[in-house]
Amino acid sequence: MTHLPARLAIRPRGPIDAVVAVPGSKSITNRALLAAALAPGESVLEGCLESDDTAAMRGCLLALGASVAQDADCWTVRGTGGRLRVPAAPLDARASGTTARFVAAAATLAPGPVVIDGAPRMRERPIADLVRALEGLGARAQILGRDGCPPVRVLGGGLAGGEATIDARRSSQFVSAVLLAAPYARRPVTLRLEDGALVSRPYVDLTLQVMRAFGADCGWHGAGALHAGAPHPYTSVRYRIEPDASAAAYPFAAAAITGGRVRVPGFAADSIQADLALLGVLEKMGCRVERSAGAIEVTGPAPGRALRAIDVDMNAMPDAVLALAVVALFADGPTTIRNVANLRIKETDRLAALECELRRLGARAEAGSDWLRIEPGPLRGAPVETYDDHRMAMAFALAGLRIPGVVIVDPGCAAKTWPGYFDALASW
């Protein structure tokens, strides 16, 4: 990865034509790391993502007694068999929501207290709904932070299991966290969704897929509940991690913006990653999408043809919102993105950040409690603030492919999920 300056000017260019190697999925890497750390014996994970978020998960799991040997993107994890140790110091989840929440649930299996903390923004991201669900399954935990946010002290001693209700309207990570630890409960776990509501369901389906790959007995129990057999420990496996669909959103969006063509190899034909749903949105806006031989190719509209504006519910693919918001700058009318309230509790308040930075580039943008409306205007270059949010940096860099004078402030924050992003962008 090239050392990045504090402010990086993006060079406009014509239609791109590129084959882009997208790094491994962060979501899958962190789920597989945790399952492998809980399993007995050695698991081999191929295609892992090395990033700030996965380093945070790895560091926490090492402190809990697992070991990880890295050989490029192939990691060998020696698991604990569910017998976690009590770390000597609080665990640092950094700015990783998946790490803080998944590890908080797993820490119930330790024999003594475990404190999970993180970066300042992590202390503003909710965890109370997860803690309440864990308590409903017999765990003991104390929230040490303000307003239901970390740090959290999990007292350990195991997870009894049984039945609990969880409020998953703000984050699906709460559900995934409970599920990932559930095979080590003393009896089977049933998790009921409060009011049947679940944001970003595809991420829970992804969790179930990873758990089954490690031998868990888990799944949906009707439309509003999930179950996991227990005690039913994971088994050690060799597991292949596919490319990150959330990361692939940026080269796909680049093809749309420049009227070019991008091919991303490595996706399974039956991939269930949430952000691949962006492909259908881009098709409706006038792009052509083709799948063949394990690759996905997106071609933007021909020169002289504008992208079509769209009104779209993105609840199931929230991480793709930022890329689409920048694509909307080049549409033929106003685009509205709906049902994305949980963007306000991500690495930053993404709805507020998008509204501000889209306006900075000349768009007429307005954000509501769970929606964003983008009306293209006379576009102009400007420095773009990134709010220490990797997706803000990666998305707004795409605007610079068409708009002269776009400068990304703190581009290094992209290392959270794609450390080599700006090197890749320069090569497209």
Name the predicted role of every residue range.
Residues 1-428:
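Short, structured segments at the rim of ligand-binding sites
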